[in-house]
């Protein structure tokens, strides 16, 4: 929250505490969530004999836990690639000033690998986690990844792909996700 006290001849933009003025201007970013969602979550936690200490936005928590203090102060975007969605937050002067999300995430990358290599989703997730990357180097053309499938066809199940081929499957989806985040930031006036 940024607040400013506007008086007849002065404008205080740091903190209006203890000041006197005619108007109080407030610039804030508000995140909303359905009350039922919070109640359901709190009920689940309570049924596990735990207490809910509080509720916080995942975008806020990700930014606070991954950005160093200087980044939060000078300004940075934190992008959190989740399974089914990607959240992003902007920090400036140690405050989150914007947050949002798009409905693309790591599961979409896994699905692309599954389709591209013709392997089950479980196998694709293991391949992504163990061998995934986004920038191909010269050694990646020679780095072979053994693909295990479950079709019953020995030739099909026991084959290899290069790490470069895997990167070629993953990179377009990640680029799409980052472009979508960039578009949302442009729409919000931050790019």
Annotate each PLM feature.
Residues 9, 67-98, 113:
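Gly/Thr-rich phosphate-binding beta-strand-loop-beta motif of the actin/hexokinase/Hsp70
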Residues 25-35, 50-51:
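Flexible, glycine/proline-enriched loop segments at strand-loop-helix junctions
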Residues 30, 35-43, 60, 91-179, ...:
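Phosphate-binding glycine-rich/basic clefts of nucleotide- and phosphate-handling proteins
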Residues 56-64:
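Short acidic loop-to-helix transition motifs that present clustered carboxylates
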């Amino acid at each position: 929250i940024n607040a400013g006290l506007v008086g007849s001849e002065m404008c205080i933009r740091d903190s209006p505490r203890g000041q006197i003025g005619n108007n109080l201007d407030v610039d804030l970013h508000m995140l909303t969530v359905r009350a039922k969602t919070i109640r359901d979550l709190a009920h689940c936690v309570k049924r596990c004999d735990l207490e809910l200490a509080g509720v916080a936005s995942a975008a806020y928590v990700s930014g606070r836990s991954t950005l160093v203090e200087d980044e939060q102060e000078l300004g940075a975007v934190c992008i959190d690639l989740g399974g089914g969605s990607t959240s992003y937050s902007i920090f400036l002067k140690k405050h989150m000033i914007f947050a949002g999300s798009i409905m693309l995430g790591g599961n979409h990358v896994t699905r692309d690998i599954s389709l591209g290599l013709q392997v089950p989703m479980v196998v694709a997730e293991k391949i992504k986690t163990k061998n995934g990357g986004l920038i191909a180097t010269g050694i990646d053309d020679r780095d072979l990844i053994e693909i295990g499938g479950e079709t019953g066809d020995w030739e099909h199940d026991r084959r290899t792909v290069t790490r470069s081929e895997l990167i070629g499957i993953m990179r377009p989806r990640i680029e799409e996700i980052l472009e979508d985040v960039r578009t949302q930031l442009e729409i919000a006036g931050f790019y």
